[in-house]
Amino acid sequence: MPVLMPSADVPTIDISPQLFGTDPTPRRTSRGRSTRPARGSGFFYASHHGIDVRRLQTWSNESTTMTDQRSTTWRSTRYNENNSHVRNGYYMARPGRETVESWCYLNPSFGEDHPMMKAGTPMHEVNVWPDEERHPDFGSFGEQYHREVSASRRCCCGASRWRRQAGESSSNEVTEEDTLSAVSMIRYPYLDPYPEAAIKTGPDGTRLSFEDHLDVSMITVLSKTEVQNLQVETVDGWQSLPTSGENFLINCGTYLGYLTNDYFPAPNHRVKYVNAERLSLPFFLHAGQNSVMKPFTRRTGDRKLNPAVTYGEYLQEGFTR
């Protein structure tokens, strides 16, 4: 059962001291501020992150023009259960039933010569992008964005601090060469009329575009438009989260809950139905295939520890639930 979060408060934290600063005092202060929301709503906004948000939004908006159902741009790379790509690719909408469409891509370091690729290890794939001549720089910018977020401490700073607070050593850091991290570009379209069959209904009667779920990740770094549609489940019921067009929304994934017996739980969240054109760009931070997830005893009380597993095993199991 998901853990009900104590609040829906989402503070904004300046993470520039952790990224660019050398003075240890503001760096410690910034890290400490990111710990509190992990025990509150499970979310916080990261400001002063150094990413060119306008360029990112322009890149994201380009995908909207390419997802027109009359275009074959994405269709040639679409995901289906019969091909070898089980993560990367275009997930098509289903007219009249499913309106949301998305594009997922993985670590650009996964080339044909990568050891995991040669071994045929699941969840390791070479990215397939739309035609570069028709869409110049689209694939290159996407892979640049993946590298910037995963290789820097933009997202790792929060995860590392949360792990240390709960008692874990810092031996399982994310490496650019092996991370299983993924980016999803999710389009919620405006439609007139909007098909009723595509709208879900929550137990409380709220109309939804995406039902409640936990993120199977270390943490999730989200860039989204300022359309208010995200909610978190709290002890006081479902509460709406604030929006920001400039800052990244960061939340705990199930990884931290697994290691800490939910001392740092993954927040249960959902997307309300809003008939408005919008894009959501979550970056799911993952460790490498062979990183060992060893739960630790601090802050677990008398609860039984979860078994130690490799991150690859944990992630693959999470995808099959």
Swiss-Prot record:
This is Isopenicillin N synthase. Its cofactor is Fe cation; L-ascorbate. 2-oxoglutarate binds at R278. Pathway: Antibiotic biosynthesis; penicillin G biosynthesis; penicillin G from L-alpha-aminoadipate and L-cysteine and L-valine: step 2/3. Residues 179-287 form the Fe2OG dioxygenase domain. It catalyses: N-[(5S)-5-amino-5-carboxypentanoyl]-L-cysteinyl-D-valine + O2 = isopenicillin N + 2 H2O. Isopenicillin N binds at R87, Y91, Y188, S280. Residues 1-42 are annotated as: Disordered.
